[in-house]
Amino acid sequence: MTSFWSWYVTLLSLGTIAALVWLLLATRKGQRPDSTEETVGHSYDGIEEYDNPLPRWWFMLFVGTVIFALGYLVLYPGLGNWKGILPGYEGGWTQVKEWQREMDKANEQYGPLYAKYAAMPVEEVAKDPQALKMGGRLFASNCSVCHGSDAKGAYGFPNLTDDDWLWGGEPETIKTTILHGRQAVMPGWKDVIGEEGIRNVAGYVRSLSGRDTPEGISVDIEQGQKIFAANCVVCHGPEAKGVTAMGAPNLTDNVWLYGSSFAQIQQTLRYGRNGRMPAQEAILGNDKVHLLAAYVYSLSQQPEQ
């Protein structure tokens, strides 16, 4: 901030503290040194106030807060451009420096443990109980907001506990997904195949997983199959089982990221979808991602209950 505003904040802060000290001392003058049964002379609804001095503990508490405030403003940045003199923080304390200090301490304490697991194959790490506990905590802190605390996903966010993987479920593939993220784009087709085509393809796609067309809706499954063969097989494959290299889902199973109702599939066909998994390398680093990949991999290796 500019020098003017720095001095403004400084003088205002110190002036306020000085005013409070003056008020405290001024009101203390003239008070009785000892307690008395006399009142100040006024009564409200039968309630009278004794003419006694401020309790000493109350007065000392007030003084203590003033001393604390002055000490705080000396140690921490609170007076304009004053950076404070808190030991251990070159150039003054800041939230960023405090965070970095805590991170450095944590890395010093846990870094060797992360490095130990990073040197092991993901499959082997996935069998280590301590590693899974650490990976679970990383997941809860960084991934559960999208995939859920139980990792079973939600609308638009995949379930990580089954064996259905858009980009592949091999350990190193999972690690790559977490490290670098994924960008999946499903184009909209309403301007290409029209509303009738959307309806027919939706009916055909639902039929691939054994779903019937809702009553009252007329579709041409054969025509939908032709449109699918002409436009959709390049991503989803000729058998509609998906292509992991492109993140295109299998349309013949019962796993639906954006819903399997007739209306939801039409919505997907009409306007497309744009799914994005953010990269975590810059946030977590390779060693933590390695541990997290092992945890995610372990979720789909557990026997069904």
UniProtKB/Swiss-Prot annotation:
PANTHER family: CBB3-TYPE CYTOCHROME C OXIDASE SUBUNIT FIXP. Its cofactor is heme c. The keyword Cell membrane applies. Component of the cbb3-type cytochrome c oxidase at least composed of CcoN, CcoO, CcoQ and CcoP. It comes from Stutzerimonas stutzeri. NCBIfam families: ccoP. One of its GO terms (biological process) is proton transmembrane transport. Belongs to the CcoP / FixP family. Pfam families: Cytochrome_CBB3, FixP_N. Its main location: membrane. GO terms for cellular component: plasma membrane. This is Cbb3-type cytochrome c oxidase subunit CcoP2. The keyword Translocase does not apply. Heme c 1 binds at C143, C146, H147, M277. It is a multi-pass membrane protein. The chain crosses the membrane at residues 4-24, 57-77. C-type cytochrome. Part of the cbb3-type cytochrome c oxidase complex. CcoP subunit is required for transferring electrons from donor cytochrome c via its heme groups to CcoO subunit. From there, electrons are shuttled to the catalytic binuclear center of CcoN subunit where oxygen reduction takes place. The complex also functions as a proton pump. Keywords: Cell inner membrane, Cell membrane, Electron transport, Heme, Hydrogen ion transport, Ion transport, Iron, Membrane, Metal-binding, Oxidoreductase, Repeat, Respiratory chain, Transmembrane, Transmembrane helix, Transport. Heme c 2 binds at M186, C232, C235, H236.
